[in-house]
């Protein structure tokens, strides 16, 4: 098991927490001076922390399913192992018919850690250089419902 170092950048910041012992994601909490009313246009919401992530691991910010069900979106984001700045979550509403206000301490997203191999990109010059698979170029629902 890897350890992730967390620095609280603001006194009111909360350390990410698992909701249950088996939870994959850690809840991220808003750390803002005053409430923010979400709109359809994206807004950055501070989490008030910075991380030290070991190389070979990345962190992903993901939406919380309960908020998504209400049309409150947290944009996906990747935090690379070499990033040491403050974490923010991009949030927006699917429509303005259901106003939503974010307050400091609200759970706004999840943080999920993954092993990430470091890879190189090699340029090839024909489709045949990529090799063949059963699927080949089939996409966008080509494997069925």
Language model feature labels by segment:
Residues 1-145:
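DUTPase catalytic domain/fold
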